[in-house]
């Protein structure tokens, strides 16, 4: 019976430790995905600006 209490205690400590480790790993992955999304958004905004300028130049050249 004493062994069961020790086993449950050790299992609980391991579960808490591994749970915190997983949360950190998952948070890092989320931050990387968020950063990729931000870079994609910024790049698309720049491309739209360049395309709009090119359209303005083409319209000006046509007259």
From Swiss-Prot:
**GO annotations of cellular component type:** extracellular region; extracellular space
What's this chain's function?
A: Cecropins have lytic and antibacterial activity against several Gram-positive and Gram-negative bacteria.
Checking InterPro entries in the record gives: Cecropin, Cecropin_insect
Alphabetically, which GO biological process terms does the record hold?
antibacterial humoral response; defense response to Gram-negative bacterium; defense response to Gram-positive bacterium; defense response to insect; defense response to virus; innate immune response; response to Gram-negative bacterium
Keywords of this protein's UniProt record, alphabetized?
A: Amidation, Antibiotic, Antimicrobial, Immunity, Innate immunity, Secreted, Signal
> In terms of domain of life, where is this protein from?
Eukaryota
Sequence positions bearing Arginine amide: 62
Extent of the signal sequence: 1-22
The UniProt entry's sequence similarity note says:
Belongs to the cecropin family.
Name this polypeptide is given:
Cecropin-B
Q: Where in the cell is it found?
A: Secreted
């Amino acid at each position: 019976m004493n062994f069961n209490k020790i086993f449950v205690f050790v299992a609980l400590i391991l579960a808490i430790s591994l749970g915190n480790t997983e949360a950190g790993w998952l948070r890092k992955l989320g931050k990387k995905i968020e950063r990729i999304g931000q870079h994609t958004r910024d790049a698309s905004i720049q491309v739209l600006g360049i395309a709009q300028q090119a359209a303005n130049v083409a319209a000006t050249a046509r007259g």
